[in-house]
């Protein structure tokens, strides 16, 4: 179920302060964050945000199509290496 419109988008305050500071100064350095739950807002367009995936920070360049999505959607947490090969089929 989506978030109520009367509540507005959720964004952690510490991340919002970092974004506003970067926009104000014109800084292009990636902003490190662990806040995967924060929503992407229009002031973030053009910034690179390094989102933590549990192991490392994945750089995410924010574009206008990403507005309304969460930061965690763009930093996958699981790596799929494929299923194990069938050893019986290889012998024949």
From Swiss-Prot:
PROSITE patterns: RIBOSOMAL_S19. Gene3D superfamilies: 30s Ribosomal Protein S19, Chain A. Transmembrane segments: none annotated. Protein S19 forms a complex with S13 that binds strongly to the 16S ribosomal RNA. One of its GO terms (cellular component) is small ribosomal subunit. Belongs to the universal ribosomal protein uS19 family. SUPFAM superfamilies: Ribosomal protein S19. InterPro entries: Ribosomal_uS19, Ribosomal_uS19_bac-type, Ribosomal_uS19_CS, Ribosomal_uS19_SF. One of its GO terms (molecular function) is rRNA binding. One of its GO terms (biological process) is ribosomal small subunit assembly. The gene is rpsS. Keywords: Ribonucleoprotein, Ribosomal protein, RNA-binding, rRNA-binding. This is Small ribosomal subunit protein uS19. PANTHER family: RIBOSOMAL PROTEIN S19P FAMILY MEMBER (PTHR11880), SMALL RIBOSOMAL SUBUNIT PROTEIN US19M (PTHR11880:SF8). Pfam families: Ribosomal_S19 (PF00203).
